[in-house]
Amino acid sequence: MAKGRVIQVMGPVVDVKFEDGHLPAIYNALKIKHKARNEKEVDIDLTLEVALHLGDDTVRTIAMSTTDGLVRGMEVIDTGAPISVPVGEVTLGRVFNVLGEPIDLGEEIPADARRDAIHRPAPKFEQLSTQVEILETGIKVVDLLAPYIKGGKIGLFGGAGVGKTVLIQELINNIAQEHGGISVFAGVGERTREGNDLYHEMKDSGVINKTAMVFGQMNEPPGARMRVALTGLTMAEYFRDEQGQDVLFFIDNIFRFTQAGSEVSALLGRMPSAVGYQPTLATEMGQLQERITSTAVGSVTSIQAIYVPADDYTDPAPATTFAHLDATTNLERKLSEMGIYPAVDPLASTSRALSPEIVGEEHYQVARKVQQTLQRYKELQDIIAILGMDELSEEDKLVVHRARRIQFFLSQNFHVAEQFTGQPGSYVPVKETVRGFKEILEGKYDHLPEDAFRLVGRIEEVIEKARKMGVEV
């Protein structure tokens, strides 16, 4: 193993000098271990990743944790390989950092556990699956209007407190319960408190045993935040490639991945591009996104929470992400204020899969008719606010009448929210969802009260609820 010495420390960037002919490759992991000799020194166990070659004998590296206590002259060891993290069953139910070290105070990962490098090429063309297959989530509004594709990439937009986390938990729960699938959650540059809450909520709702979690939070150096998404993806790829699973991969938040890359780029002395972002923005995003795909054996479907800086959708970071997305799920605060959960905006959410060739003619027609009805209702709201319902034509009154029932029927109770609502969660198969909305559009349930449609699963539950309300069904 080649040994070198620290010659310069600039915050999270460390320059290391090696002997001639022993220069480590780009992306290699280097280790610095140092025992404190007195009270003034600190114990150091630091991993660096090679980013640049400077001349014949020096490398510039990015630190994966704090560089406190590092001094020039300290010994550095080249591991001869990129950062490698544990994969397989040992990762389920556990929480890791960017290096694949457990941070949940649980037992150590066995030394003989398989480890994979976090840097690897995307699957080859001949390995990719060309079939477009829908991933059934059991969540009506998603399955009907913006369906997810196996191996696809979904953008999850929403401000604070509109239900992103609950939606993520329900997806993890439904994939585990209905499909027996595995989920991997990568917390990239978000609040430590949120990660802690998510871990405990998952423990309480019982989905943690089907989930591996990786965190590189806001307080960590940019190197860790930039690589933690790759750590999570490597764990997800193992379940896809070796076990043939359909894996759900969550990234919260993909913007922080770009932000960390921008910080690293500036520290490495690269010339910034538009809005101060790194010149390699599209390449870095592509290297991550191209690995998220369906192969002949399994799939990795990713759901990426996207923070939009200053609500500017033309900002290079979100704009680069959009180019890779197959579907978007937009959460709307107005809907959550109305008590409609999940607060998914049925008109703003989109999916490439909503076409007759993929979902079938009936599903497509019902979905489009639902959107048309809701759009017309939205247009009529101003008139209703100023003149009242009485001024509408009979036809428009019927549209409003049905649109309100559709709006409420797009809500449902979640399994993971049972402890708060006291109501059992519901998983609705796509066929049942399409049938329910088709019958509402046909006017079959015009006589039932609006409240009967709120927070229920299948259409049969609406009839049952109306019966309990004393309505003649």
UniProtKB/Swiss-Prot annotation:
Protein EC: 7.1.2.2
SMART domains: AAA (SM00382)
Keyword entries, A-Z: ATP synthesis, ATP-binding, Cell membrane, CF(1), Hydrogen ion transport, Ion transport, Membrane, Nucleotide-binding, Translocase, Transport
Reactions catalysed, as given in the entry: ATP + H2O + 4 H(+)(in) = ADP + phosphate + 5 H(+)(out)
Major enzyme class: translocase
GO MF term list: ATP binding; ATP hydrolysis activity; proton-transporting ATP synthase activity, rotational mechanism
Record's subcellular location: Cell membrane
GO cellular component term of the entry, any: proton-transporting ATP synthase complex
Membrane topology recorded in Swiss-Prot or TrEMBL: Peripheral membrane protein
Binding residue positions for ATP: G158, G159, A160, G161, V162, G163, K164, T165
One Pfam family recorded for the sequence: ATP-synt_VA_C
Family: Belongs to the ATPase alpha/beta chains family.
HAMAP family membership: ATP_synth_beta_bact
Biological role stated in the UniProt entry: Produces ATP from ADP in the presence of a proton gradient across the membrane. The catalytic sites are hosted primarily by the beta subunits.
Complex and partners: F-type ATPases have 2 components, CF(1) - the catalytic core - and CF(0) - the membrane proton channel. CF(1) has five subunits: alpha(3), beta(3), gamma(1), delta(1), epsilon(1). CF(0) has three main subunits: a(1), b(2) and c(9-12). The alpha and beta chains form an alternating ring which encloses part of the gamma chain. CF(1) is attached to CF(0) by a central stalk formed by the gamma and epsilon chains, while a peripheral stalk is formed by the delta and b chains.
Protein's recorded name: ATP synthase subunit beta
Protein species of origin: Anoxybacillus flavithermus (strain DSM 21510 / WK1)
